[in-house]
Curated annotation (Swiss-Prot):
UniProt membrane topology term: Peripheral membrane protein
Organism per entry: Naumovozyma castellii (Yeast)
Protein name: Protein transport protein SEC24-2
GO cellular component: COPII vesicle coat; endoplasmic reticulum exit site; endoplasmic reticulum membrane; Golgi membrane
Biased composition (Basic residues): 1-11
Region (Zinc finger-like): 226-251
Binding site for Zn(2+): 226, 229, 248, 251
Assembly description: The COPII coat is composed of at least 5 proteins: the SEC23/24 complex, the SEC13/31 complex, and the protein SAR1. Golgi apparatus membrane; Peripheral membrane protein; Cytoplasmic side.
Biased composition (Polar residues): 33-45, 53-74, 106-129
Pfam families: Gelsolin, Sec23_BS, Sec23_helical, Sec23_trunk, zf-Sec23_Sec24
Coiled-coil parts of chain: none
Cysteines joined through disulfide linkages: none
InterPro entries: ADF-H/Gelsolin-like_dom_sf, Gelsolin-like_dom, Gelsolin-like_dom_sf, Sec23/24_helical_dom, Sec23/24_helical_dom_sf, Sec23/24_trunk_dom, Sec23_24_beta_S, SEC23_SEC24_subfamily
Length: 912
């Protein structure tokens, strides 16, 4: 007997909710009546085409507890990899696959290595655990199995003897650090033979707020480091018990422990965090960092454009309103955070904010400075004020600023002088400068001119003429900012040309970020909501001030370069005046000498100041096995990390060379890997025709490269340079999880979601429907689909959707009543299906406290034979449909070949 309380799977045409004949929430002017959201159909201006794709939470080995012995995360990952590979081989009708016990990999000297199927098999060193290589013909797996994008990387196989206290905590979490290669060639020749890149993907902080999942922290002020290489004590050092010393795993130097401390006497020594956790924090003594005598407070300086453009598009009001609502969210743990406001048009406007009193708000004094040639502060008092002591008066001032400038006719914006004066104001303290603008800087130092894109876009000159830095000020000023410990963030909202390519240099080289809102209108509720939520999330994010990043590696390895929004002081030292929580970095490695040991190591250390003024150290240590066998290198390669590395290098190629160089790099890199795999690994058997064979753990790499080539950052076509520039900006800063989402959007079929989808599980987490392939061929004309991109959510309503579906979702009777463009789903309490869809959308927008992005929802109705011929929406909806299907990246869209065509052409090139 069925349980009546269990929700039924949605099967149409049976309706769950019947709209009244006169809908209680009718659409008026394209918007839901009674809601603040306004619909904006994208007709004359295309929506912002942000990067796309998704990387969901990785699967866990659910039956780990049933294993006969303890399984580390690496063992669980290995079990998962084997299960996936076995499934792939079953699909390929391979036979005689041995039964595998993952625990056998961790039994010393068992010699139990799995025989690869169908490839060359060299003799392996007995006793050394290895990932085994499983072949797959990519052409037989079409459409691609996109769930493979959710898999963890091949496990890092470590023997217990490697660690002083072996446990699962010695494995570096891929949330913080992961390598493109989880088995490192022992020689540079072997690395070159593989054609695989060797790099680390670093995300120093997992969440926007440090209170979420903090790392273990040592608070006893002991920071133990190697006296030769300065590496930090970690789980992989060798403890010399007789001498109470330790051998550094990076350089081999023997070091002592502090004398007279019981913390470093046996058995207490083995309980220390340094020997237990590969990722951890330290609170050093005040004398540890001698460069900083007294940590200054956190400082936030806002430079706000008050020219006529910000009045017309409602951005000034939006900024003031969002800042008022965020005053209590700005980190102010020690009540020392300082705030300053500078407004700019053709002059600079300073505000002296008085202290709060019990008598109510007091008026602030405004000082107007028209001399833009030299930095000049009108007064030394009350320009930089305490957030705690002036909070009410700051709110009062912010609410008045739109009124003060509402009648302006000034079209100028002196950004350069405003930045110079802001740096002068905070030169002794550093901090963040946040610029909010709708106008191209057109006055004073840093003046920019519109660039003529006609005849240049989509040519060999595009990168040099449209995406280069137009004025040297935007590079030279960042050098000064790094000296003064100032980070610059940009929030740009405009329908006009803004030269994002030039302005983004300010954030790129100071550790900040550029946020762009094209076609912004504050009167459109979706635009207002998106900016307000992202601005508030950005301001509430914890920060690490005065940060330096120092990567280290074993003897024989070399740090080549670092990529991301950072300032490179040297190849192995990067600085960030204020390190955010929502970016990642790539550190490229090389092999300069033969690696003779069984393992090599990398360590990334961050020295920074917290928001409370304390110095802190975060250390991430990664141990990797070495190998002399090319099979092991391929079998242990991380396809998602490789794709992230490719994206960073391709971005560099665009900026330093051209788009053709970037596209050639992506294509050639993939081809060389496949050629060498075929040459060195594959046993050719062409009886059944030419195949495109690859290792199972790398089979999604061609898809990812193809998606990068189709991304707005790299694809061919005439693309507005500001959209191109912001896409490149995101490519060089997005964390791996969101960069994969950038390349391959997640698509959900909603009209047939499982019973549990949209409802909380036993832990209160909303269950998501299974993803489907990004292809229009999977879309039913009567269906309902959600396309999840990094910046937007697109709800695709099939043009032949039946009335029951339309009623359940929108409370309407006819699919042609559904609005198109920016909107929100109405809340229909009587429709359980509507509530489940709203929960799915809210869950996606939460971003797991990892990104500030709030995705705008677009509703797009598919075409139908019953569509009214003379509908006024027809001309407006066609470009919206074309934009939506451009995210279905497996198809032949935006003038690019489909994934199937890409593979066929790739095979043809490889066989020449």
């Amino acid at each position: 007997m069925s349980n009546p309380s269990r929700p039924k799977k949605r099967v149409y045409p049976t309706a769950q909710y019947v709209a009244p004949s006169s809908p209680s929430m009718p659409f008026q002017g394209g918007a839901f009546s009674g809601q603040t959201m306004q619909s904006q159909v994208s007709g004359s201006a295309s929506p912002y085409m942000a990067p796309s794709g998704q990387f969901t939470q990785p699967m866990n080995a659910s039956d780990a507890q049933n294993q006969p012995q303890f399984m580390t995360p690496a063992q669980q990952q290995l079990k998962q990899q084997i299960s996936q590979a076995t499934t792939s081989m079953n699909d390929m009708h391979l036979h005689n696959v041995p039964v595998i016990d993952p625990n056998a990999y961790y039994q010393p000297n068992n010699g139990n290595n799995i025989q690869p199927t169908g490839e060359n098999k060299p003799s392996l060193t007995p006793g050394r655990p290895t990932n085994n290589l499983y072949p797959v013909d990519i052409l037989t797996e079409l459409p691609p199995k996109i769930n493979d994008l959710n898999l963890l990387p091949p496990p890092i196989l470590l023997e217990p003897e490697i660690s002083t206290k072996f446990s699962e905590s010695v494995y570096a979490s891929p949330d913080y650090i992961r390598s493109t290669l989880n088995a490192v060639p022992q020689s540079n020749a072997l690395l070159k033979k593989s054609k695989l890149p060797f790099a680390l993907i670093i995300k120093p902080f997992k969440h926007l707020h440090d209170m979420n999942a903090p790392l273990p922290c040592n608070e006893d002020e002991f920071v133990i480091r190697c006296r030769r290489c300065r590496g930090y004590l970690n789980p992989f050092v060798k403890i010399l018990q007789v001498e109470s010393k330790w051998r550094c795993n990076f350089c081999g130097c023997i070091n002592g422990f502090p004398d007279g401390s019981e913390h470093f006497q046996l058995p207490n020594l083995y309980n220390r965090n340094e020997l237990t956790y590969s990722s951890m924090d330290f609170l050093p003594s005040s004398s540890y960092s001698q460069q900083v005598k007294e940590e200054p407070p956190a400082v936030y300086t806002f430079v706000i454009d008050v020219s006529i453009n910000t009045i017309k598009n409602g951005y000034l009001f939006s900024v003031a309103n969002a800042l008022v609502n965020s005053l209590d969210l700005i980190p102010n743990h020690d009540n020392k955070t300082l705030i300053s406001l500078i407004c700019a048009d053709s002059s600079l406007h300073y505000f002296s904010v008085p202290l709060d009193t019990e008598d109510g708000p007091k008026e602030s004094s405004m000082f107007d400075i028209s001399d833009l040639d030299e930095p000049f502060l009108p007064t030394s008092n009350s320009l930089l004020v305490s957030l705690s002591q002036c909070r009410n008066n700051l709110e009062h001032l912010l609410l008045k600023i739109p009124e003060i400038f509402k009648s302006t006719t000034i079209q100028s914006f002196a950004l350069g002088p405003a930045l110079q004066n802001a740096s002068e104001l905070v030169k002794d303290k550093g901090g963040k400068v946040i610029v909010c603008s709708s106008t191209l800087p057109n006055m004073g130092i840093g003046k920019l001119n519109p660039r003529d894109e006609r005849g240049i876009s989509n040519t060999s000159k595009e990168s040099k003429d449209l995406l280069s830095c137009q004025d040297a000020f935007y590079r030279s000023f960042t050098v000064e900012c790094n000296k003064l410990q100032i980070t610059i963030d940009l929030f740009i909202a405009s329908g006009n040309y803004m030269d994002i390519a030039t302005l983004s240099n300010l954030s790129k080289y100071t550790g900040g970020q550029t946020h762009f809102y094209p076609q912004f209108l504050g009167s459109v509720a979706a635009d207002f909501t998106k900016f307000s939520k992202e601005f508030s999330r950005h301001l509430s994010m914890d920060l690490s001030f005065r940060t330096v990043m120092r990567p280290r590696c074993s003897i024989g390895l070399r740090i080549e370069d670092s990529y991301g929004h950072l300032f490179n002081r040297s190849t192995d030292l990067c600085s960030f005046p204020a390190m955010p929580r929502d970016q990642s970095y790539v550190v490229e490695l090389s092999i300069e000498d033969k690696l003779t040991a069984d393992y090599c190591y990398a360590q990334i250390a961050f020295l920074y100041s917290t928001g409370t003024g304390k110095r802190k150290i975060r250390v991430l240590t990664l141990a990797l096995p070495t190998t002399t066998i090319l099979h092991n290198v391929f079998a242990s390669a991380d396809q998602l990390a490789i794709a992230t590395y490719f994206a960073r290098i391709a971005t560099e190629k665009v900026m330093k060379n051209s788009f053709d160089h970037a596209r050639s790099f992506l294509n050639t890199s993939l081809e060389e890997i496949l050629i060498n795999y075929r040459k060195e690994i594959v046993v050719e058997n062409n009886a059944g025709g030419v195949t495109l064979r690859f290792s199972t753990n790398l089979k999604m790499l061609p898809l990812l490269v193809h998606m990068l080539l189709k991304n707005i950052a790299f694809r061919k076509g005439v693309i507005p340079s500001d959209l191109r520039a912001i896409a490149l900006n995101n490519m060089e800063s997005l964390p791996l999880k969101y960069l994969i989402k950038n390349a391959y959007p997640t698509v959900y079929s909603l009209h047939d979601i499982p019973d549990e989808a949209g409802l909380p599980d036993e832990n209160g987490v909303i269950v998501m429907p299974p993803p489907m392939n990004d292809t229009i061929s999977s879309f039913e004309k009567y269906g309902l689909y959600l396309i999840n991109t990094p910046n937007e959510l697109i709800l695709w309503v099939g043009g032949n959707a039946i009335p029951e579906l339309v009623s359940d979702v929108f409370g309407l009777q006819d699919v042609f009543q559904v609005p198109n463009g920016k909107n929100e789903l109405p809340e229909l309490p009587e429709s359980e299906f509507n509530q489940r869809l709203r929960s799915i959308i809210e869950n996606i927008r939460a971003n797991d406290d990892e990104q500030i992005t709030y995705q705008t929802l677009y509703i797009v109705r598919g075409n139908s034979q019953n569509e009214p011929a003379n509908s006024s929406q027809n001309k407006e909806i066609v470009p919206l449909r074309n934009w939506a299907v451009s995210f279905l990246v497996e198809d032949n869209v935006v003038g690019c070949e489909s994934y199937r065509e890409f593979l066929q052409n790739l095979k043809t090139r490889l066989n020449k």
